[in-house]
Amino acid sequence: MAAFGRQVLDWHRLIPLTWACMARQTPHLGEQRRTTASLLRKLTTASNGGVIEELSCVRSNNYVQEPECRRNLVQCLLEKQGTPVVQGSLELERVMSSLLDMGFSNAHINELLSVRRGASLQQLLDIISEFILLGLNPEPVCVVLKKSPQLLKLPIMQMRKRSSYLQKLGLGEGKLKRVLYCCPEIFTMRQQDINDTVRLLKEKCLFTVQQVTKILHSCPSVLREDLGQLEYKFQYAYFRMGIKHPDIVKSEYLQYSLTKIKQRHIYLERLGRYQTPDKKGQTQIPNPLLKDILRVSEAEFLARTACTSVEEFQVFKKLLAREEEESESSTSDDKRASLDEDEDDDDEEDNDEDDNDEDDDDEDDDEAEDNDEDEDDDEEE
């Protein structure tokens, strides 16, 4: 009996030790409650379009009065949104818990909730989930949605179809980050426009499927470019500069403006530092690498590649712009002259037709007179 009593006392001594051990091993439980309240701090959105208000009941991330402050915050938020308090608080906590599981920090979640602009919490969660499935990390997702919050209003089915289409183009598995930074409208633009750009690169520019994927990844601005301008830019590199397909892809040539390309290329050409290769791909002088022409700043280009002063290059750019204006004006004059010639030819043809019609009428009149004379002769006989 005495032994049993000692055993009971030992159990009582072990109970507080067990709870202390559990508290040390799971410190995140209390922290998670504080985190949830801190995340709710900036969720109050005005009904006229998304101005975030700081609520006085929330003080800092380190100390939050719970549960009264949290209840007041959620109630204030949901009253502004016209949502039932119990239902809305549960939805907020569920969405925030999901975002935390995806790897978003407190700051990330605050930013995302501040840019949702009328989109429902479920819509926000669905769109973000699609981005995560495409291989994006939390930081790029926040940057893209802050830059283009209209993406949150996309129908989720459209988002999923576009995601599947981009994966077929090879833009999944983390390759979509740069595309979204440079061209976030890839999810909102017509799929036919994307198809037209891809078809142009494959059929007219003769890039391989792998090269097209690399171009879309490294030069996503081609998706916004006029197709005629894009084709001319490729032809300028291939025929005028003598650059082959692998070098065009490797140097990311298509991301640069045609003005910049022509200015630097023609400047080097007139300095005698660049030659268009012959049919065998040979030149009398070694041409500078494309990366040393386009992928450097203007100061570095002039100092290392062209070896001239800034003043000389500025004068050249003005002269080149004047030459192109004169060339365009002469081209327009030639077109106008050719149109005038065509109109004159049409007028001459119309006049010839009128003359022929008059001749036909005269012949008909002569025939009618001859027939009348023959009839008169017959009557006299």
Curated annotation (Swiss-Prot):
Processing after translation: The mature mitochondrial protein exists in 2 forms differing at the level of their N-terminus, one is starting at residue 43 and the other at residue 48.
Key words of the record: Mitochondrion, Repeat, RNA-binding, rRNA processing, Transit peptide
GO molecular function: double-stranded DNA binding; rRNA binding
Subcellular location as annotated: Mitochondrion
One cellular component term from this protein's GO annotations in UniProt: mitochondrial large ribosomal subunit
Region (Disordered): 322-381
Mapped MTERF repeat ranges: 142-172, 177-204, 209-239, 245-270, 290-318
InterPro entries xrefs: MTERF, MTERF_sf
Biased composition regions of type Acidic residues, renumbered to the chain: 340-381
UniProt-listed Pfam families: mTERF
One GO-annotated biological process of the protein: regulation of DNA-templated transcription
Region described as Dimerization with NSUN4: spans on this chain: 310-327
Residues annotated as transit peptide in the record: 1-42
Entry remark concerning the domains of this protein: The MTERF repeats form a half-donut shaped, right-handed superhelix, where the concave side displays a positively charged path for nucleic acid interaction.
Function summary: Regulator of mitochondrial ribosome biogenesis and translation. Binds to mitochondrial ribosomal RNAs 16S, 12S and 7S and targets NSUN4 RNA methyltransferase to the mitochondrial large ribosomal subunit (39S).
Subunit composition and interactions: Heterodimer with NSUN4; this interaction may be required for NSUN4 recruitment to the mitochondrial large ribosomal subunit.
Family indicated by similarity: Belongs to the mTERF family.
PANTHER family, alphabetized: CGI-12 PROTEIN-RELATED, TRANSCRIPTION TERMINATION FACTOR 4, MITOCHONDRIAL
Name of the protein: Transcription termination factor 4, mitochondrial
Gene: MTERF4
